[in-house]
């Protein structure tokens, strides 16, 4: 992002004029294509040259035509090529929206960095790894009692997205252009695929979609943080929350004020939240607390009223369940986490007297849910739905080295990601599926049977599937039963993981 800011010479004063780089800095569209900002690389973007799709004259003409009335009318002829430009209108609006997302992301990122500098999170870059939340669970969750898994509602109304952005983007013309993009996408998708408009929107224009989603989540979490910070000041003087971003908070002079009178039969006292933890991941969030369910119920109604009153998204309090960690397990990023109580007896002796003490220690168990893993492997044609390995026919044309390397990389990354699991028995089943699928793919390529190919190849293929920790331990210790048992039970956290893409990238 710093590189783009240097090229565009964009600082915070450009919040009042965001259309200037979009119209007069045409190399933005080259950045979108050449720097891999558009991860969903369509055939159009790969086959069309820069001179044909990103000239300044075409961009200016297209923006002018977008404001004409006949351009917004969706008809059956829109799928054909435009006689003026040579491509359909949706392609050009997608191109400009990608450039628009790049320009607007810069002040958005500056706002995020400036907000983080004002907090105690000095090394905020450590939060980039989503896998770093698991050590947090190990340290904090044994001391917590209740957890709630919340699905962040989305999508919201298009106009609410524009109103959310207008509080920090002061360029009115950019907001009008954003509104035009949103309504055009909505009209286009409603005409072509009415049931999967959001899915189509996110796949056809991922950068633009992620920018809108991140702005929505940033606004939602800023209000949530505001409520959390102000909750400690509301004990003596009751206050009323106004869900307006400009005039958000108002003090009440009288000591007690009924808040949400239609939903609560008695006066509601705000009180300080001693322990409340919030974690967000992949469109979901987790709320955890040590206190009684009263605190969790209060924040559950906070969230419901926030979504309904501010973002106009329908949500029900009954859809947010509050579970006790000692009795219920919850799924998180492919793990199945639960609370385990380790009982032990400690003998204590003081002078001539001795007595026994029962000691109970809480520990988080992170297990691997094998069913989603088998489902992902079956979807990518590595096995069938019951886990029987299959040959990967689409990779049969590759070289032997590439085939083995791809299978081994997927296996190592899965072990890398699930290294923090308490038990790794399910991972060894996945390794068996990938290893046998690799052998079947090679045998299919060489038109041989699996048995014959294994005899000719020997045990060299097995070495490619050793994981990183297995290689290190094999150099230090002999491969005995005790070593494998420690490896099976050991928990090694790798904090450099962003995502697992190998099952998808090669398709």
Curated annotation (Swiss-Prot):
| Keyword list, A-Z | Chloroplast, mRNA processing, Plastid, RNA-binding, tRNA processing
Please give the coiled-coil regions recorded for this protein.
none
GO biological process, any? RNA splicing
One GO location term (cellular component): chloroplast
InterPro entries attached to this UniProt entry: Domain_X (IPR024937), Maturase_MatK (IPR002866), Maturase_MatK_N (IPR024942)
Q: Which first-to-last residue range defines the signal peptide?
A: none
Annotated localization = Plastid, Chloroplast
* Main location group: plastid
GO MF annotations, alphabetized: RNA binding
Q: So what does this one do?
A: Usually encoded in the trnK tRNA gene intron. Probably assists in splicing its own and other chloroplast group II introns.
Q: Which family does it belong to?
A: Belongs to the intron maturase 2 family. MatK subfamily.
Q: What is this protein called?
A: Maturase K
- Print the organism lineage: Eukaryota, Viridiplantae, Streptophyta, Embryophyta, Tracheophyta
Q: Which gene is the coding source of this polypeptide chain?
A: matK
